[in-house]
Amino acid sequence: MPGLLPHVDPDGLLEYSVVFTDRALNHMSQSFQGVMRDISATLKNVYKAKSAVVVPGGGTFGMEAVARQFGTGKKCLVLRNGWFSYRWTQIFEMGNIPSSATVLKARRAAPGKHMPFAPAPIDEVVATITELRPDVVFAPHVETSSGMILPDAYLRAVADATHAAGGLFVLDCIASGTIWVDMAQTGVDVLISAPQKGWSSSPCCALIALSEAARTRIDSTQSTSFAADLRKWLQIMEAYEGGGHAYHGTLPTDSLTRLRDVMKEIEAYGFDKVRAEQQLLGDTVRAMLARKGLKSVAAAGFEAPGVVVSYTEDAGLQSGKKMLAQGLQIAAGVPLQCDEGADFQTFRIGLFGLDKLHNIDRTVASLDKAFSQVL
């Protein structure tokens, strides 16, 4: 007998479990088991990972799950490039997680209100890791508040120093867009992503990829959270990979199905192609804004293609209200928590999603027209 509603699980069962109704896909269904296996396989393939984990909630849930799993009672180092890597500090302090935490902040290369920011110099980072020998190093691949990206060579240098000190390297890739990070090449041990930016899907979880070293290490760790127990969610994924299913908390089954479908769409189109499109779109938008006299917060060499953050003296632009009148939703500027000063004022543009990437001319033209009206 087929499922009651054909658009939910046409080849499924009549729903009498204590978990779902007929209007949602059951986590025990053959259909959803395939969804989880597909998500795992895609994450492992794209990020060159040993293991994949889905943690319900969102990217921040994943950050906290990782912090509580690997950072509890440990010596931690954070590379802070803005507000959303300051989030690591907020998580640490709220949960009293590490035994100690050191922060290396991004900084301006030279004094000046509108001078660009660069991450902490890599030599300083390596020297600090060598001296402190942290158990875990946390960094943002792309920092959403400043539009900074850490290049692969920077990541590799951090990873090498961290591994030499016996530590794990955690990289927040939630805002990376389709600039996929190769964990094998860069040395990243724990990578955190989410569906709603680079994966062009609905927010519903964190997507976490583990290196072989992290997969080995996690077995000797103990989380301090029940709902955000990373090791438990890893076990759930491994149950699905083994052809079965398991339950810890309720997974967002329908949203994860949508994510799987988009993953398949991107795979068919080409992971390398969307990566190239992301870079081209970012470069083109940054050039357009520069022509209009808008200065980038991110210094040359660290300019993210998926998030563009520019200085402004216009409160209407900083809040995004002027762009609302043009039919565009941008993001308001936020502090960096990097000693930027009280007069720091920016606006932020996100360049995420297949619909932007596949239509670069249209995407840029929409922005160009709107800025021509408000500047």
Across the structure, where does each feature detected by a protein language model lie?
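Conserved C-terminal alpha-helix-loop-beta "cap" of PLP-dependent enzymes
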Residues: 290-351, 355-362
